[in-house]
């Protein structure tokens, strides 16, 4: 990616404080990395951090020594701050999330309209290059942007972090498109933002937790109905019947699989159950029987194949007990149920739902790289901090932090803004560094 000023350091921080007043504007905003090397070295040399204060449960007090286990917030030019603390934190940060200026008409990049994009790219390049040095080998950086600069930012980050370390471009639904016709005939209304995700080392990086979308169960079922999509979880096993031991086979590792048949089982459709027992209240029927509602699948597995070959029973319902060697039930005795002569595997509704503290049942679904379930409405009021523009939902930051870090890991955000990243990191028992 080539652009004017690429081989320079942008001297100012490009905030409104730097650009709005003549006496704060640098004489020469760009320093060439070859011609002005000495001046750049002086500019980026470590600075003395002053006015240090510690905030804890005992209030605020001045300190003269910093404990690395403490969280850190620095107020000042973020480029200079990063170079100042680099020696202490290089290779120690598990996650970097930033939400930089989007380089729109509302931002402060006004040096030269002709080179507006180049100025922004120089600004980002200077910061991303030093940010990479902070990441641990298994760390990741996520940068949020809109479609204005996303294509250019992607190529820039490919250059800095390596194309092989690109993981995802996550699309986030940030607002409702609405019914206004203001864009009609020219373009579609933009209601998405994007998060570019890169690892430090692709071989060392692993996603921590697969992000999940959540929706109240009955709302989800109603949505499918409106879209003409059938909902599969409609069978309820009300009685597991009499369980009889049939024998034992071995899995591929030689571990035992115990086989059973079930006689006198009772299965009913959820709609019939709602009519018979709940006066037609379908929600009540689902909520009361969530652990007994199922669908079946013919998904292939080595265990199912062994069961189909060995099971000599004409019972409609059969089951096995075994101990998985991998997966979420690793090392635990696990029961699988099968239906019919083809031994279709039971899949339980309870495995894709969970109950909240207030009694709601939410349906879970892998979010993938389309995050359209996060509410941006009234986000400016979250945390009792009013921030009219650019504030991100706490649920977004929670998802990102869960995705790429563990407890006690360090999370860095050098475009703090409303400090949502720091607030969520603290709630999730992560250490944080913030620069604003």
Language-model features: locations:
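Conserved Class I SAM-dependent methyltransferase catalytic core
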Residues: 118-171
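DnaQ-like (DEDDh/DEDDy) 3′-5′ exonuclease domain used for proofreading
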Residues: 1-94, 105-117, 126, 285, ...
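Non-catalytic substrate-recognition/targeting regions of SAM-dependent transferases
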Residues: 44, 49, 318-380
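Flexible, glycine-/basic-rich loop-and-beta segments that form/coincide
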Residues: 177-247
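Conserved proline-anchored active-site loop of SAM-dependent methyltransferases
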Residues: 91-106, 157, 411-426
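Active-site-adjacent "gating/activation" loops or surface patches in catalytic cores
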Residues: 94, 98-106, 356-398, 409
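Conserved S-adenosyl-L-methionine
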Residues: 117-121, 125, 150, 394-436
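Glycine-rich adenosyl-nucleotide cofactor-binding module
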Residues: 60-84, 378-410, 416
């Amino acid at each position: 990616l080539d652009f004017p000023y690429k081989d320079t350091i942008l001297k100012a921080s490009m905030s409104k404080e730097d650009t709005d007043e003549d006496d704060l504007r640098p004489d020469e905003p760009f320093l060439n990395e070859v011609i002005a090397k000495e001046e750049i070295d002086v500019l980026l040399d470590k600075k003395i951090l002053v006015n240090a204060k510690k905030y804890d449960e005992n209030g605020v007090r001045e300190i003269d020594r910093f404990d690395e286990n403490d969280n850190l917030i620095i107020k000042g030019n973020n480029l200079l701050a990063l170079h100042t603390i680099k020696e202490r934190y290089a290779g120690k940060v598990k996650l970097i999330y930033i939400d930089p200026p989007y380089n729109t008409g509302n931002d402060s990049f006004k040096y030269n309209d002709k080179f507006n994009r180049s100025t922004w790219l120089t600004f980002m390049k200077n910061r991303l290059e030093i940010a990479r040095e902070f990441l641990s080998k298994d760390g990741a950086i996520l940068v949020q942007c809109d479609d204005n600069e996303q294509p250019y930012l992607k190529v820039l980050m490919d250059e800095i972090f390596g194309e092989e370390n690109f993981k995802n471009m996550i699309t986030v639904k940030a607002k409702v498109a609405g019914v206004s016709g203001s864009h009609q005939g020219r373009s579609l209304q933009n209601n998405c933002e994007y998060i570019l995700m890169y690892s430090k080392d692709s071989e060392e990086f692993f996603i921590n937790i697969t992000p999940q979308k959540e929706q109240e169960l009955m709302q989800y079922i109603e949505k499918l109905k409106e879209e003409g999509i059938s909902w599969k979880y409609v069978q309820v096993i009300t009685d597991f019947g009499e369980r009889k031991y049939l024998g034992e086979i071995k899995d591929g590792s030689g571990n035992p699989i115990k086989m059973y048949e079930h006689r006198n089982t009772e299965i009913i459709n959820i709609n019939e159950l709602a009519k018979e027992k709940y006066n037609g209240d379908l929600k009540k029927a689902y909520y009361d029987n969530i652990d007994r509602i199922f669908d079946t699948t013919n998904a292939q597995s080595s265990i199912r194949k062994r069961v189909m070959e060995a099971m000599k029973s004409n019972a409609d319902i059969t089951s096995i007990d075994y101990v998985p060697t991998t997966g979420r039930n690793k090392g635990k005795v696990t029961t699988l149920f099968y239906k019919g002569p083809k031994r279709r595997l039971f899949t339980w509704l309870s495995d894709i739902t969970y109950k909240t503290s207030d009694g709601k049942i939410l349906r879970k679904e892998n979010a993938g790289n389309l995050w359209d379930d996060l509410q941006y409405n009234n986000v400016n009021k979250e945390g009792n901090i009013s921030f009219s523009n650019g504030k991100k939902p706490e649920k977004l930051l929670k998802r990102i932090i869960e995705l790429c870090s563990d407890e006690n890991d360090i999370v860095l955000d050098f475009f703090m803004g409303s400090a949502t990243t720091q607030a969520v990191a603290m709630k999730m028992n992560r250490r944080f560094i913030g620069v604003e």
